[in-house]
């Protein structure tokens, strides 16, 4: 089976435990206002690779991974190519490779046949990096263009099967840095028993040039990065120091 790949990154240190080989898949249904990779939105803009070829490429970097590293598949939204993911990760596990998915959870549904595929994928997935775009449903739709209800459902399911997750939240002034919303996000995280790490990602506008190149309007072009004080405040509210997984 072939998948649509946007690009590879041979040495990533912020996308899962240890050093990682990152596979960025093409295709995403969300249109997050702070997205810095709009060039990944269209699936067929990516280059076709077989799962075998992707794994072969990744394994050339295996000597850098150490005991904790491995492969992270990001995007775009990797769950849009779930069949390809299953094949890639199944091959990776045959080689003893640690597997991680970086996802916003947008495609998740408990309806079959997709859900049966997802359960199969979880059998060969070690860790998930998951975004909480916005805890408020109305604001989530404004921010991403899609509902977040199924994403909450995905969090609940992953907790049920005890699959380790690493939660990330993009802190964007005027959109996701409201203390009330941060507190609600914290309260939701507290209901989950499988959270190993919580991380704040300060918003930046470094992707603005890509929007210009693609002829797209970048609606946050006048939005500044959050101050150190607001980042510290968010970390305290979300109790980031409480979650110590993969920090050593």
Residue ranges, per PLM feature:
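Short glycine-enriched, charge-decorated loop/helix-capping segments at active-site entrances
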Residues: 39-43, 141-147, 215-223
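Conserved AdoMet/S-adenosylmethionine-binding subsite of the radical SAM
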Residues: 59-63, 67-70, 75, 79-201, ...
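Generic domain-boundary/flexible-linker signal
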Residues: 16, 34, 43-46, 82, ...
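Auxiliary Fe-S-binding modules of radical SAM enzymes
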Residues: 2-13, 166, 171-248
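N-terminal [4Fe-4S]-dependent radical SAM core
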Residues: 1-25, 29-47, 60-67
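Short, conserved loop/turn and helix-capping segments at secondary-structure boundaries
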Residues: 48, 145-148, 225-228
């Amino acid at each position: 089976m072939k998948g649509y790949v946007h690009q590879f990154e041979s040495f990533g240190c912020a996308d899962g435990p240890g050093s990682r080989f990152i596979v960025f898949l093409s295709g995403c249904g969300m249109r997050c206002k702070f997205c810095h990779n709009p060039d990944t939105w269209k699936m067929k803009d990516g280059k076709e690779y077989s799962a075998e070829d992707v794994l072969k490429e990744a394994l050339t970097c295996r000597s850098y991974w150490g005991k904790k590293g491995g492969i992270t598949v990001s995007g775009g939204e990797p769950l849009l190519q779930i069949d390809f993911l299953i094949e890639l990760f199944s091959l990776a596990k045959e080689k003893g490779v640690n597997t991680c998915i970086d996802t916003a959870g947008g495609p998740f549904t408990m309806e079959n046949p997709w859900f049966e595929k997802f359960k199969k994928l979880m059998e060969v997935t070690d860790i998930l990096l998951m975004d909480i775009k916005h805890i408020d449903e109305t604001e989530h739709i404004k921010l991403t263009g899609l509902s977040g209800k199924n994403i909450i459902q995905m969090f609940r399911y992953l907790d049920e099967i005890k699959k380790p997750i690493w939660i990330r939240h993009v802190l964007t002034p005027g959109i996701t840095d409201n203390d009330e919303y941060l507190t609600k996000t914290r309260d939701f995280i507290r209901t989950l028993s499988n959270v190993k790490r919580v991380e704040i990602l300060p918003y930046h506008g470094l992707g603005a040039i890509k929007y210009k190149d693609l002829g797209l309007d970048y609606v946050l072009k006048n939005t500044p990065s959050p101050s150190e004080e607001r980042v510290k405040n968010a970390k305290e509210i979300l109790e980031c120091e409480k979650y110590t997984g993969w920090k050593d």
